[in-house]
């Protein structure tokens, strides 16, 4: 996101982990200005239990050449969407869902196409697997892996297979990128006699659409073996081979 700002791109931070630290990002070179406002702070008397309120001037939000969403902001903007019918409801959800993220990305891409945004975009989502689908929300069963996978495949198909790649054409005035972090789980069934294999939450539809993937271990299965070499009595692993 620091490099994106330096290149004239707008970072669109979608923080469904609710863990993004602006101060840490600023220390790394990210440009953002704190906006201060009066915030009511509760004080509790430990002896009497009496609650009093005082006002302090604190950071309420951040401003700059970026767009930021967390779960609360997603619900505020898209929480009235009923994704099963495509209509809007009278009340807003307080739980963000996978479809909200796709709606967010499509809305911003629409604004760019309509001329309301005149810069390229870097979408950064942290992370797939941190929120469930609309179907899970309605059923009260957050954590249904198959429903999440189906929702990601359907909601993001046009984004990752058309809208983002189309911006790479020379005829496109702006170049857009989607970077995402994917939560994982360990599958013990694929390699019964060896270490568990790392699998992505939310299925593999995003994995198949990804142009570049960075994996952090957990890939050794029964169908893979390490290629090693020995030099001066030391063994070195230099590649893996599929059987």
Stretches found by the model and what they are:
Residues 146-243:
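Phosphate-binding/switch region of NTP-binding enzymes
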Residues 1-6:
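Walker A/P-loop NTP-binding motif
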